[in-house]
Amino acid sequence: MNKEMTVNGKSYTIIKLLGKGKGGYSYLAESGNNRYVLKQIHHEPCDYYQFGNKLEAEIRDYRKLKEIGIKMPVMLETDVENERILKEFIEGDTIYQLVLEDKMKTDYIEQLHRMCALLYAANTNIDYFPTNFVVHNEEIYYVDFECNDYMEEWNFENWGVKYWSKTPEFLQYVK
């Protein structure tokens, strides 16, 4: 890939696409000896989700989750003009990869339950899909910044947990 993108005038080399979400594309980026996640907001339609200003929403959600105490990468910079966010890169496998490779540990689910206790007390849900969580030094990090008002239907116990092991829902997604 190796193309360049800038954040507030500073250039970053794009190493690879890490993933595409409802709000944007996340790339592994490099500058000097440091690695980052560079997220480019996109405006592609999403059938099941309505957005206002995506960049403002990311900033607002990041601040809210930080205040709640959720373990996640640091938002280092925002580039309003180019609709880009520079985040700390958390090295490690996603929960999705660990489930796929039969390397999941019950401790990761226990850590998520502790995270949920903080979230639910703040009337908040996050996107519990396993690609949004990275394990680094045996600790889970929520690497997406999306959050919403709490709805029981979309909490971890009723929705997210279906994708944290090789359930029919997980296996259907893999196809």
PLM segments and residue spans:
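Juxta-kinase regulatory segment immediately upstream of eukaryotic protein kinase catalytic domains
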Residues: 1-15
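ATP-binding glycine-rich loop module of kinase domains
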Residues: 11-17, 22-56
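The N-lobe alphaC helix and its flanking beta3-alphaC-beta4 segment of protein kinase-like domains
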Residues: 50-68
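Conserved structural core of kinase catalytic domains
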Residues: 51, 70-109
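Hydrophobic residue at the +6 position relative to the catalytic HRD Asp in the kinase catalytic loop
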Residues: 128-133
